[in-house]
Amino acid sequence: MRDEVDLSLTIPSKLLGKRDREQKNCEEEKNKNKKAKKQQKDPILLHTSAATHKFLPPPLTMPYSEIGDDLRSLDFDHADVSSDLHLTSSSSVSSFSSSSSSLFSAAGTDDPSPKMEKDPRKIARRYQVELCKKATEENVIVYLGTGCGKTHIAVMLIYELGHLVLSPKKSVCIFLAPTVALVEQQAKVIADSVNFKVAIHCGGKRIVKSHSEWEREIAANEVLVMTPQILLHNLQHCFIKMECISLLIFDECHHAQQQSNHPYAEIMKVFYKSESLQRPRIFGMTASPVVGKGSFQSENLSKSINSLENLLNAKVYSVESNVQLDGFVSSPLVKVYYYRSALSDASQSTIRYENMLEDIKQRCLASLKLLIDTHQTQTLLSMKRLLKRSHDNLIYTLLNLGLWGAIQAAKIQLNSDHNVQDEPVGKNPKSKICDTYLSMAAEALSSGVAKDENASDLLSLAALKEPLFSRKLVQLIKILSVFRLEPHMKCIIFVNRIVTARTLSCILNNLELLRSWKSDFLVGLSSGLKSMSRRSMETILKRFQSKELNLLVATKVGEEGLDIQTCCLVIRYDLPETVTSFIQSRGRARMPQSEYAFLVDSGNEKEMDLIENFKVNEDRMNLEITYRSSEETCPRLDEELYKVHETGACISGGSSISLLYKYCSRLPHDEFFQPKPEFQFKPVDEFGGTICRITLPANAPISEIESSLLPSTEAAKKDACLKAVHELHNLGVLNDFLLPDSKDEIEDELSDDEFDFDNIKGEGCSRGDLYEMRVPVLFKQKWDPSTSCVNLHSYYIMFVPHPADRIYKKFGFFMKSPLPVEAETMDIDLHLAHQRSVSVKIFPSGVTEFDNDEIRLAELFQEIALKVLFERGELIPDFVPLELQDSSRTSKSTFYLLLPLCLHDGESVISVDWVTIRNCLSSPIFKTPSVLVEDIFPPSGSHLKLANGCWNIDDVKNSLVFTTYSKQFYFVADICHGRNGFSPVKESSTKSHVESIYKLYGVELKHPAQPLLRVKPLCHVRNLLHNRMQTNLEPQELDEYFIEIPPELSHLKIKGLSKDIGSSLSLLPSIMHRMENLLVAIELKHVLSASIPEIAEVSGHRVLEALTTEKCHERLSLERLEVLGDAFLKFAVSRHLFLHHDSLDEGELTRRRSNVVNNSNLCRLAIKKNLQVYIRDQALDPTQFFAFGHPCRVTCDEVASKEVHSLNRDLGILESNTGEIRCSKGHHWLYKKTIADVVEALVGAFLVDSGFKGAVKFLKWIGVNVDFESLQVQDACIASRRYLPLTTRNNLETLENQLDYKFLHKGLLVQAFIHPSYNRHGGGCYQRLEFLGDAVLDYLMTSYFFTVFPKLKPGQLTDLRSLSVNNEALANVAVSFSLKRFLFCESIYLHEVIEDYTNFLASSPLASGQSEGPRCPKVLGDLVESCLGALFLDCGFNLNHVWTMMLSFLDPVKNLSNLQISPIKELIELCQSYKWDREISATKKDGAFTVELKVTKNGCCLTVSATGRNKREGTKKAAQLMITNLKAHENITTSHPLEDVLKNGIRNEAKLIGYNEDPIDVVDLVGLDVENLNILETFGGNSERSSSYVIRRGLPQAPSKTEDRLPQKAIIKAGGPSSKTAKSLLHETCVANCWKPPHFECCEEEGPGHLKSFVYKVILEVEDAPNMTLECYGEARATKKGAAEHAAQAAIWCLKHSGFLC
């Protein structure tokens, strides 16, 4: 038989490929086609006049170029084209027309807009124009071959219907393509062809999540190109509505089959309503409208086409004759290459190898059974499936490629991610059974190769024989060797299996004979190969297009959608499975004179018949499209839908499967547990149907869902999944859009009411917003100076310096209203230089009366005193008018007076020092120059000559002077009568003052004989609230700094203003700053106390601490309270969520908690309560201190605020030292984190002073609901009884003895040890208890360290807590208590990891904190937290019990000596201390991170690298390695400040902060006596039932407060009376025995409406008894509830008398 044969097959020209411009012979063929065009008149489309039709170009020669599917058109002479045009279509489908789009136009106008530079009509072909015209009139399916320009028709249609999507329209055009590569390709074509905004949405691109984002996306774009799954998802969940789509284009629309679950079909069946007035225009494109093996049969062909038309509500149109396409596309030559069947001896050899592989597989299965516990059935089945898949792949490659191919396939799979989809994540050799099989198989198969033959010999031409190479593979090699010499040759080989593609590509690349072929493989993204990502696929295609590769071995992913061009040879190594596959793969050969080849076994008649059938079926399909033989369609299967009417979200049975998988994937998981639903199908022969039972993961809120009895397994599966979605939505796990709640959404339910945050004017929670700072109300109360008498409350400010090296003038504080008690006794320490300080105390001194003159003098004195402090430049002129500024009395001013005092009667009576005040105000600077003393000269003994006149010595002494030569102010302390200008300058024995001044300033003294003035410089005011003390130093006396100056160079400014007054004045701004902040804190306390009586005990100073940030640089800040409040907030919210949401998993609980406690939400709630105005976030800046007499000069209003407080403003004279300007409204910048921190700090403050009750009330006041009811705690304990059947598998008594606690509710203890991989008990696991226990432990540890180390900084407090409760620390506790022995788990790998880590700790107990050794399994730490959660519930939320327990087995202080500081942090501190530079970089490869760390010291660079599972682990290892190397090469010591504090710092007794709640009584719970529940032995047999049911797990919801429980008849049992209903008791009995829940059914209903009676029956399967099903009937009752209750009583009676219930 010949090796090849040419088939005389006439291939329709409409399915032929593209021509290459670069080849010269294309030009010759092009000219032939142009001549043929001119010699004949082709019928193309519907009859119309070319001269008058709007869409045809004018009668001129118009050039056509490439467009659409990257095709090449020919120049076209319009005058020679006939007007007899015909369109092939079916008349069986009714026409769809629309008047709004009956005409072609650019953006809806006859003439294109000047902006529409791109007009796709200019390069359109005749048939494209006519098909586009039809598409504007009705829904159309264009049937044209690959390369015929279908995309260009779609582009023209978008252009013509542009008026529907251009602004201000709110609709959009959506272009659907089935693959990501095709989406990107088609989006580029559209963007290049029309001036519309095009957006891409597909896998790997930016994900639009929210409804608002999709609204913006639609508004911003006219065309959206996406995969159909994305559109289906958006329609299902109401992100996009069908009414918003004006044009819907389906590329490769043949996927829309009536009986398929393809997204195309789902979109049309569920969401497209043909009767709707707002429905999109439909346009479909396909090269084969019929798909499927059976669809091409004569009886099904018409039915398939009609069904496609019905589903898309469109007609199929094509060209009638292929002649018109001949000028645009080329037909490949179809050839068949035969190979002979294997010889008998080779066949025997192959059989021998098959048996060898089968024997290896059986041995691996036997070893697998020994490794896996009998209870771990799912793991066993999973590994069996993986093993079978690997075995089938080797057998397949052995038969199709030969022995060498099988060897390569084994090695390829062994060394790659062959089983990445389903294999357990663990890399433990014992669990890698597939690797064991592949290794043994490769070794066994390699034994068949001669030992003296090396790889190069095997790949030589002589070795191309059986059994090493199959005859099929040899034939392929021959074909490629023939074509290898052809220029510009490119080839695609199509195979049906991924393993064939990878192995064949490997073999071809290693054949010396085919070295001119450069090969790679191309498989789908869903293949499960990590190496085949979207990026790698794009890289392969680009390399193929750039001729770097010229051979692709592809699966069916290369048949359609991918932009694979210029291909000359297409080989079907494996025959196509369908006609569609035949047509699509043939369309890849687009080059002229290309070849489409089949490899066929000459002894296999089926293969020859299959090829012949492809052509026959294709011709039959073309004929059927033209002449429809029947109007019959496929039966439409209307799926059941679940719709949420509130939102419009809708899901079908088919889509519910993927939604259920998506929900399960969102459940908490790790490398040991991948949650997914498991399906079991039970055929019911007598009814001829199937029931599907879904078992959900153990951490899902429902355990099992069972479908109704349905005819097929697929229908049953859809029904069960849809019921699961319904139930999950009812439980609130899926929101009203049928989606799991996003972590980005704000959890509104935990706030008491709604709050429109966006309506706050200019004050949001964004980063860095402007807020007004509150001024105390007491400071705003004015006095009226016009009255004859003003009474002010007075307070004595006492200064006590330490040491007593200064004298401070006594001052008083005067204001209109009295201070609160806490403020009256305020005392603070002001820190000076050199460890010195001043203690300040406030004492109330009654009421002081001021007459009219006195109040004016007091006001003037304060103004002058504040000028001296802050605006001394205004005192430089010779004359300063003495009058109070009007701005001092504005509403924004503060009204208090600071005046010097005199003490009388032993300091018990105070009075204002009016002598000093009047003396100061009589100073020369405040008098006109004419009054100055100038006539006394020369100076006498009682007078001194100053620069501004002669003055009495008494006036000069204790005054403020100004020197013109040095521009400085000085306090005159004394007159140096023994020293004058001729005296030597101190510290200089030769130079006199005369010489010194002349040399420095060029000034000659005229009166050098005058005595010198001993003066003290006037210093600048500082923030004295800042902590300047060093704990290891003692305060030291500091001599005051004095200098001597000549009087004649000094200007007398203010008399009587002594240095003692100056010293006191320098303290007052710090004192008043603290007083103002304290008064604000007291005001907030009163506001809160009015609403929350429970916090009345909190002190104002505690509130002030909570309001003061670290930025204020004071000795108090909110940070420690914030750490405490943060821990309590987490605890309180966790407790609330745990009890109120029994159906939510741990991951969703965590997300909801995060939404409550995150900064954005806390900021939002704080602003709602106006808390931001109380926050103190600015340090005292003397340049920004404003008081009465020194008002703020920056007037702020809505217009000026942005300019005044612009963050980008230029620095000016109003700029403060802190970079912020203080305005008249007290605006300052706050960040949302600052506001959130204040909320948490307030929680901590109320916690310390008022306990849990006060903190909880505050949280409720601010809008965080953390309430719960005692009944919810009791219900949680009762619900744990469902785990009691598992108590027989664990020795609970031993566990309780180890924990030193006896549980009242044993089910809680059992639940705390159930890993989510264990799902043989009806569901439930420890994760919810872990969530609760984590929050409890976090608060307890915070309370512990907060009280034990009172001087610990907040950052150190957080670090210490993290180190004490991190995973390794808790895992060590779990190991020490042997908690792993009680773990319920079905993961082999997890058991092995725990065992390895336990053995490691046993051999090296101090190495657990190091990076060496096995990694610490998180499960061990989770067990500790879940135990604490169970204990917390079992003792009724008695935190004292948990505190005692925590101290007993955690003992946080015990291991402080072995505290392991993070090597990352240690390295950072080390580099900072030695000023070394460090650099870090990370790369990811094969799922692992390699971290390179560089440290540069003294010009030398030290580099280390380490690898970890994630970047953090790699960085930790690299840091540890770097520290080791540094210590080895350098003489360095590492210091740990945290360690130093712990060893040397103050340590107090540990206390539980704030717990003052009453424990919940869970001891005397009324309910089911669990001892009377028999756990029966397992019997064989299964009762069958067709009705559906749902098993719920979790806590029962607490009854509404407004509803009273109806009295029910008590069920008397041996254990005592029970107040539960019989129905509830029956449910609990089923749960406790792991039975299915009872099924209640109304079987009889009689009587008129007002006298109706009901009879119920209950069906109960006793699964542990052989085929036992109870069916109990109750008596007639007036209500359904009563009837069901009576039926339940009957069932209880039956169970008791049957011995199942004692």
UniProtKB/Swiss-Prot annotation:
Its EC number is 3.1.26.-. GO terms for molecular function: ATP binding; helicase activity; metal ion binding; ribonuclease III activity; RNA binding. InterPro entries: DEAD/DEAH_box_helicase_dom, Dicer_dimer_sf, Dicer_dimerisation_dom, dsRBD_dom, Helicase_ATP-bd, Helicase_C-like, P-loop_NTPase, PAZ_dom. The keyword Disulfide bond does not apply. Its cofactor is Mg(2+); Mn(2+). The keyword Endoplasmic reticulum does not apply. Residues 17-31 have a biased composition (Basic and acidic residues). SMART domains: DEXDc, DSRM, HELICc, PAZ, RIBOc. Residues 89-105 have a biased composition (Low complexity). Residues 475-629 form the Helicase C-terminal domain. GO terms for cellular component: cytoplasmic ribonucleoprotein granule; cytosol; nucleus. Mg(2+) binds at E1330, D1422, E1425. Residues 1083-1251, 1292-1436 form the RNase III domain. The record marks K1418 as: Important for activity. PANTHER family: DICER-LIKE PROTEIN 4, DICER-RELATED. This is Dicer-like protein 4.
